[in-house]
């Protein structure tokens, strides 16, 4: 197969590992810088051009769309879909999961547990909004933040009111969320491919930070997840329609709660913490899907 890896960063560990996994399973891997793709949208033969030539002959793509380029990245993935190329994460699912509000709304419809979350537009909604999620302390999040940036813990009602006012004054879209204190600055990251959790780790934030993101200095350790957590992670990925995803779960007093589903989950942290290759299963999954598409057999993966 010829597999395109959509990434702006060819030197990144994750990009390199995906290339290696494709090659070790006998496929051709091409790293494509998403932002350098330009598209010809027409009803006869939609195409993508790249550095002066047309991209042809691809069987599948693995999108690694960075949060800062969601709009353009999804357009490129969608164009590949229009050309009949299999996308291991399609454009609709990436867009769904990237917007934390949309994602939580979809998860809530499936009855998947999550911290109580509020969303508002007008500043005069603030006191009731704060009460709705159980009062302070509470967490305030930018809708499209990532790597823990734009996730704030407001310890008091006054702090919460001023942070919410400031964000809304800047026209930022924010979520207001119940703070799960008992998770103690840690969460569980499950790496899912298809309908399987391939690897999981517990992430613990640095001393004094409630955020567990590895990019902010958190560290990972191997963890055994429960059957309920496994089921929940898989259901969340299915609700998004993703095939490759990183699911963040908080362990709360009322059981596991989903925080979010990431469509371009980090690969370095989970592989180094667990010693499990998560890239091989991605390529294996793509092989099954592409083969099933060709023969029109029902897809069992
Ligand atoms: N409601 C909450 N209660 C307790 N801790 C929370 C809550 N929300 C977020 N956190 C902590 O903050 C971290 C970052 O939050 P979240 O995953 O929502 O943001 P992110 O910026 O999208 O991160 P990622 O890099 O995983 O995409 C979480 O991993 C968790 O440790
Ligand atoms: Mg995220
Ligand atoms: Mg997260």
UniProtKB/Swiss-Prot annotation:
The lineage of its organism: Bacteria, Pseudomonadati, Pseudomonadota, Gammaproteobacteria, Alteromonadales. Binds 2 magnesium or manganese ions per subunit. GO terms for molecular function: ATP binding; metal ion binding; ribosomal S6-glutamic acid ligase activity. SUPFAM superfamilies: Glutathione synthetase ATP-binding domain-like (SSF56059). This is Probable alpha-L-glutamate ligase 1. The gene is rimK1. ATP binds at residues 141, 178-179, 187, 211-213. Mn(2+) 1 binds at residues 248, 260. Coiled coil: none annotated. One of its GO terms (biological process) is protein modification process. Belongs to the RimK family. It comes from Shewanella baltica (strain OS155 / ATCC BAA-1091). Transmembrane segments: none annotated. Its EC number is 6.3.2.-. GO terms for cellular component: cytoplasm. Residues 104-287 form the ATP-grasp domain. It is an enzyme of class 6 (ligase). Mg(2+) 1 binds at residues 248, 260. Mg(2+) 2 binds at residues 260, 262. Keywords: ATP-binding, Ligase, Magnesium, Manganese, Metal-binding, Nucleotide-binding, Protein biosynthesis. Pfam families: RimK, Rimk_N. Its cofactor is Mg(2+); Mn(2+). Mn(2+) 2 binds at residues 260, 262.
